[in-house]
Amino acid sequence: MCQVEFEMACAAIKQLKGPVSDQEKLLVYSYYKQATQGDCNIPAPPATDLKAKAKWEAWNENKGMSKMDAMRIYIAKVEELKKNEAG
């Protein structure tokens, strides 16, 4: 796996037309953040901001995962979503 494949997956996810569940969106987001920034480095948002809190928790669950592992998982998840869309 390399940076080019990751960048291609980042572009491909923007082209998806089919429905993607909120849970899948959170997973993809969390692996993207881990791959590009590493461990979550921002304070937890207030519990009243449900969307931001969910995104923070999803990213924070990947703590300790290497950027390369996160890239691999991100690429695999995007491929899975593309296959599901194709039927």
Curated annotation (Swiss-Prot):
Residue stretches spanning the membrane: none
Domain ACB: 2-87
GO BP, one annotated term: fatty acid metabolic process
Signal peptide span: none
Designated name of the protein: Diazepam-binding inhibitor-like 5
Family in the record: Belongs to the ACBP family.
Primary subcellular site in the record, as a coarse category: cytoplasm
Any Pfam family hit: ACBP
Role played: May be involved in the energy metabolism of the mature sperm.
Annotated Gene3D superfamilies: 1.20.80.10
Naturally occurring in which organism (per UniProt): Bos taurus
GO cellular component, one term: cytoplasm
Residues that, per the record, bind an acyl-CoA: 29-33, 55, 74
Keyword Cytoplasm in record: yes
Cellular compartment(s): Cytoplasm
Keyword field: Cytoplasm, Lipid-binding, Transport
Molecular function in Gene Ontology: fatty-acyl-CoA binding
Source superkingdom: Eukaryota
